[in-house]
Amino acid sequence: MIAMSEEAKVIAFVAFCVESYKAAKNLSGEGVSSLFTRFGVDRYLYEEYEVLHTMGIDAVLADIDRFLEVRGGLA
């Protein structure tokens, strides 16, 4: 088995969050990517990986919603 670098783990986590959010909100990949980039969610997930990756996915998705709500990204 090949060990993943820390950087690869973070990237995989962010991708997992994008895919999970897409499925949970019934959005397109392009829509989630645009939303996350516009409001800085992608950067937030990357920078807060150490804390977020220890949480369950439902908690992470709820955290993303709170993050977006504070920044005006949720209608």
Predicted ranges, named:
Residues I11, V32, R71-A75:
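Generic hydrophobic segment detector
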Residues F13-C17, L45, F67:
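N-terminal, charged low-complexity regulatory/assembly segments
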Residues E50-A75:
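Long, compositionally biased
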Residues I2-E30:
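N-terminal acidic leader/helix
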Residues Y21-A24, S28-H53:
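Amphipathic, hydrophobic secondary-structure cores in small proteins
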